[in-house]
Amino acid sequence: MKNLSLTIALVFLLVSCKTLPEITPKEGSFEVISKQNTTLWNENHATFSVHLQNTNTKNSCEVYIVKNGSKKWISPSLLANKSLDFNVPENASVFIENFSSENIKINYSINQ
C-alpha cells in the first residue's frame, strides 16, 4: 500500500510539473501599425488554437508561427475582412506583418 501511495504521488507530481500557463486574456483586439509588425504570445504556454479576424475592409496582413527561431507562414494570409483559424504549438509565438499603409485592427479569441 505504501508503494502504491508513493507511485500515485509521483504521478501527480510529474503531471503538475508539466502544466504550462494558459494564455490570458482569451479574447480581445490589437492593432498592427502600418508597415510594421507585432509579435504575440511570446511566452511559455501550452498548445492552443486561435481565431483571428481582420476588421480592415481593404488590407491584408501576413501571419507566421515562430518557434525555436524558425518562422512558418500561415497560408492563406489574413485577408481583408476575413478570419483565420490555426493552432499555435507549445511555447511558439505569432508574428504578424502589415505591409499596407493603414493600421489593421485584429480581433482574436483563444481556445486552450
Regions found by a protein language model. Name each.
Residues 43-52:
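Short coil/turn motif common to extracellular beta-sandwich-like domains
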